[in-house]
């Protein structure tokens, strides 16, 4: 249940920043987006949530691979086409990391340059 706890905390944090939560766990063949939100300005944000209880295997941010980024990009394009009929809407990708326990670990929002 740790993954769901981390996603719930990330969603609450993003909503606290004024974003509207549009969807959790958007799935498509070969990819998934943990959270889809919309900023007050209308930009859609596709978020991967990563949590690591310890640094034994690196930080939460270090667990995001280039393969995962490619899958996120593909899933975001799929979402745009499926939900909005086009893939040229203002949007971006980000990772929310939680290092430590899901309920009180250090949370960071990291924009991705893709």
Curated annotation (Swiss-Prot):
Family from the record: Belongs to the UPF0102 family.
GO molecular function, one term: nucleic acid binding
Cited Pfam families: UPF0102
Xref: Gene3D superfamilies: 3.40.1350.10
Protein name, UniProt field: UPF0102 protein Deide_03080
Organism, scientific name: Deinococcus deserti (strain DSM 17065 / CIP 109153 / LMG 22923 / VCD115)
């Amino acid at each position: 249940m740790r993954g769901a706890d981390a996603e719930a905390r990330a969603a609450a944090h993003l909503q606290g920043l004024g974003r509207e939560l549009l969807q959790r766990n958007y799935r498509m063949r070969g990819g998934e987006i943990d959270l889809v939100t919309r900023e007050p300005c209308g930009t859609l944000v596709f978020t991967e949530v990563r949590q690591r209880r310890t640094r034994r295997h690196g930080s939460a941010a270090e667990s995001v691979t280039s393969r995962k980024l490619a899958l996120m990009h593909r899933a975001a394009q799929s979402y745009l086409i499926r939900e909005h009929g086009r893939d040229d809407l203002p949007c971006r990708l980000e990772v929310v990391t939680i290092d430590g326990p899901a309920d009180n670990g250090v949370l960071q929002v990291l924009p991705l340059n893709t």
